[in-house]
Amino acid sequence: MNNRIFDIILLCALSLILGSCKKSTPVSTSTTEQKSVVPVVCVYTLGAVNVDLQRAMMDSLRVHYPKCRMAGNIHLPDSALTTKRNDHKRYRADVLNKVLCHYKSDSTIVVGLTQADIGLDNFRGRAHSGIMGLASGIGTGVAVFSSYRPHGNGQLFSVMLHELGHAQGLRHCPDIKCMMQNAKGGNP
């Protein structure tokens, strides 16, 4: 029953994304280019990730990305640890994205899922800020997200769709109901 509710929420969220946001790149009107290509999404776990969380995430992803697959586990590199925290381990999301870029091909989107705390150094005037997810750039096809901050799988899946939107070329949207709205460092 819970998976069905998440699927309904995700379908509504995807409708919002597609209905209220625009790609950052021009859309072709050529009939030969209008064919919908469903990308292959390769999901890597970063560090230890609960099997139930992996399964729930993959079930929800497959609703929108039928070519989604678990691609393997990547050890959380010590080089990604921030030196700005002393109370617990936090990994720099930008460094994790650089690691994930090595697994990217032209025909895939690569996402990393972790249960570890992730963040960015020198983010919005703060020495270090914890975040829920980060795409490596608009349209780059690489993103990382963490279950550390989101409140439950529903919010985690929203973060996942938001970062996948960036990875596929979507920018932030001013509409507060849109999945691509900017959280501005908050927890929506």
Question: Where does each model-flagged region fall?
Answer:
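Walker B catalytic acidic pair
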Residues: 163
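Metzincin-family zinc-dependent endopeptidase catalytic domain
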Residues: 51-159, 167, 171
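Bacterial Sec signal peptide processing site at the extreme N-terminus
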Residues: 22-35
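Post-HEXXH active-site segment of zinc metalloproteases
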Residues: 171-188
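Fold-level signature of zinc-dependent metallopeptidase catalytic domains
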Residues: 36-52
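Hydrophobic helical h-region of N-terminal Sec-dependent signal peptides
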Residues: 10-14
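C-terminal motif of bacterial Sec signal peptides marking the signal peptidase cleavage site
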Residues: 17-20
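Bacterial N-terminal signal peptides that target proteins for export
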Residues: 1-9
